[in-house]
Structures are given as C-alpha cells and as structure tokens.
C-alpha cells in the first residue's frame, strides 16, 4: 500500500458559515455570526452621543461659552466655533472622529447643525464608519464681563494717561493710533479727565498690554500703585485694584525748545535752540538753521525734565518777501535765507527780518508763514536766559500757512472713540461761558489736527483715513475757492479706506469725541 504524503503548503479552503441574518456565506474563522453589511445595518456605534445639545452665546459681546468659564469670540461656521461645538458632545471620545462640517442654517434661527463622520469597533476586529447630524440650540445669555460692565466699580485695573499741555492734539493723535491697532478692545470704559484720559479694564494683564502699547508709540513714564479691596483670612487670598499713572512728555510737535547745555552736547552737539519736529516713542528735535536732528528717549528726558519755551498758540503770522536757497537739503527740508515781515506791520513800518529756515522748499515770495517772534517776546526760562543772545534769532519760522475755506467740507474723515458719559451735575451750568470756551477750544484743536494730517504725509501713514460719503462735493469735482490757496495740501483719494458697516464703533452708543494729537 502506498501513502501519498501531505504537502503542508498545499492550499486548504477555509471553513465558511452562513450569516444569521441574510444567509450570506462568511469566513467562519473570524468568529462573527453576521456579515459586514448586516453589522453596519444593525449596530449603532454612535449610541450614547446626543443628537441635540445647547451652546451659550452672549448677545452683547457676541462670544460663545467654552466650559467651564472661558468666553471665546468665534464667527459662524468658523473653525473656532466647530471646536467649541465638538467639545460640548459627550461620548465622542469612544469613537474616532473622521470628519466634521457645518450644515447651513438661517443665522436668525438660533440653530447650529453639524454633520459628523465617525469610526468605531462594532464587533471583534470589525471597524465600521457612520455619519450622523447634531443640532445645537443657541441659548442667549450674558457673560460675566458684560454683566460687570453694567454695574459700577467693576474694574480691576485702570490706566490714567496725562499730559500737562494747554491743548489736546497729543490725545487726538493717540486716539487714532489706538483705533488703528485696536488697542481698546479689552477696555470696559473710557472716561475723559482734565489733561488726559482714563482707561478701565477687568483684568490686570489688559492694562499691562495697554502700557506696552503706549511705550511703543509715545514717549511716556509710568508708575504702578495698588489698593487692597478684600482679603480672605482663611486662605490668605487677596483682591487688589491696580492703577497705572502714565505721563506723556509735555513737548509737542512744532514747540520751541531750549535744551540744557549738557544734554545738547550729548545729542551730537546740536544747538540748544531747536524745534520739536516729530513725536513717536522718542522726541525728535531739529535745528532750523542747520537741519541737524537728534532724538531724545523718554528715559533720558525724565532724568532732568524741562518744558517747552513756546507752543503753537504763540505763533505769529509773517509774510515772505524773498527766498534765497543755500542749496543744502535733508529729506523734504531745504535750508534757505528768507526775508519776512510781520503781517500786522504791513503799512505801519518797514521792519523786516532775515531768517535762516528749513522751509526753503515750499516758501515763495508773497506766502504767509507762521513763526515764533523771539525779538518781541519775554520768556520766563532760566535755560533761555543762559543762552548767548547774539546767537538767538529774532524769528523762528515753523510752517507755511495755507489759506483754507472757512467751512471746508473734506472728502475724508476719521473714526472717533466712544466716551463714557458722566452723570450730569445739576450744580454745573453747561451753557456757561467757560463750558462754551472749552468746546470751542476742543473744536479748534481738532481742526488743527486735521490740517496737520493734510500737511504731513508721514503722519498720515500712522492713522486710518476713511472716505466721507456725506461730503457735499466729491473730491474730483472740487473747484478752487477764492479764499483757498492753489497749492493747499490735499489728501489723495487712494490713501482713503472704505468704511464698512461692521467697522462701526457706535453700536447703539452715542459717540462723543475723545480728545486726543501730534
């Protein structure tokens, strides 16, 4: 008898059995009693995942709640909102999330629908994939920050900005910088005080963030103080209110300044008799007779502070009689010898003054200029008294004076910052002469700031200008007025931004200008 040897590598057919549900033959070695299709039809791996959920939304600040207590700003159908919705679903950790997407709903329906695709193990070694929808009901409520904003004394930190000058141009400029960089988004409220502004915050780090911003844009020094509000004797936990006192260097653009002799030598041996030409995080001075410039950091200034000798309120109008250029220039400044006469002296006397000035590039015979009349002024300053009078000019020219329309309708405008309205005090007469003078002074400062923006292209780069749709005449159709100079500076329409509805700052709140400069 012959035996046929068994080849161990010979293919053997696997045992099969019938699906208990549909009778389809399946591999019996897997240990399953149902086929894959029947498993998908009968097994629900999404069991335990709710099909409806709630999500909290603050109507005031338009933020969504991310438990336990974080409020996040998220647009509809954004990745941030999708993450918040997924975190609200219980049981999602038992399956593997493959895909998630929004299903469009009407924005006013207060419903958010999401389509989810998940994978999970249905039976032994069997992975199935299923898709389902979840609907979220948006519940409107009020977040703690907004709730505190409607009550008094809710702030935890305040930034008090002050500048001891007789005008508000610095704060007009600072206001535009804050709006451009959205540095006011964390502010609870803003109130106007004498010589400055007060910003209130719910958290200390928001105030520190504002201090860092101010350090980057204007020359300041600040001082921190704190006040104990409450203390838990059992845990030792304490609650404080923090105050940051910020003082801006009291020197503004176009101010006439006498530098201390030692400081002038340390700044490149610049002349002591200078003009302030620019304000940023440092103070820039310029010698109008040589065009030399030098920067002064706020830390150096506060070691030995000094005040300006004269400001723009003391400018006098002069008429240009002759301009003789020296051929020396630096940037857009041209050094020239200019002959001027005081406007009020015309027809009275023949007194003329010979001035070396940086305005040689824009001045011509017959133009009007503004300058400081040193020869006819009496200054109460020890620094000025220490100067050699032989080297002090009779006149220092500052800028060219352009004749403008008395009621000029500009084709551009600026955003303004909403201000917290203070309670009306019945004891104050808001129609008094003092109040009217204060309003007129504020309007004059704002008009001077607008003119400064028109004349200084470099200054315009740091602010946002918007198209004024309410202007009476489009800029292309402007006809020169008899009272306006032909070379009066104009802002090109290409420099203007379109004002979008969502960029509006006055959402149901009456806007009042907050004075702000340069």
From Swiss-Prot:
Pfam families: NMD3, NMD3_OB, NMD_SH3. The keyword Cell membrane does not apply. A motif (Nuclear localization signal) lies at residues 399-415. One of its GO terms (molecular function) is ribosomal large subunit binding. A motif (Nuclear export signal) lies at residues 493-502. GO terms for cellular component: cytoplasm; cytosol; nucleoplasm; nucleus. It is found in: Cytoplasm; Nucleus, Nucleoplasm. GO terms for biological process: protein transport; ribosomal large subunit export from nucleus. Acts as an adapter for the XPO1/CRM1-mediated export of the 60S ribosomal subunit. Unlikely to play a significant role in nonsense-mediated mRNA decay (NMD). This is 60S ribosomal export protein NMD3. The lineage of its organism: Eukaryota, Fungi, Dikarya, Ascomycota, Saccharomycotina. The gene is NMD3.
